[in-house]
């Protein structure tokens, strides 16, 4: 009877994220960039549009230290801040 209860159930199959992993910054390599970004958000009533420069710098730090995949900054929404070239090469 116990096999009849489990007959129709499906097991959960986890799947990886679409863009790969996003490792935590355990060593604090980008901590100063993160704190600068968070301070900007706090000072600007959490209006993230006012802190795009800080956000860009934080993501650049993460990409340089292999804490996230390299992506062109234009693809991340910073095309207007890149002066015609992306520092993050594919």
Curated annotation (Swiss-Prot):
InterPro entries: CHCH (IPR010625), COX19 (IPR051383), Cys_alpha_HP_mot_SF (IPR009069). It comes from Homo sapiens. GO terms for cellular component: cytosol; mitochondrial intermembrane space; mitochondrion. One of its GO terms (biological process) is mitochondrial cytochrome c oxidase assembly. Residues 1-12 have a biased composition (Polar residues). This is Cytochrome c oxidase assembly protein COX19. Residues 1-20 are annotated as: Disordered. A motif (Cx9C motif 1) lies at residues 30-40. The modification N-acetylserine is found at residue 2.
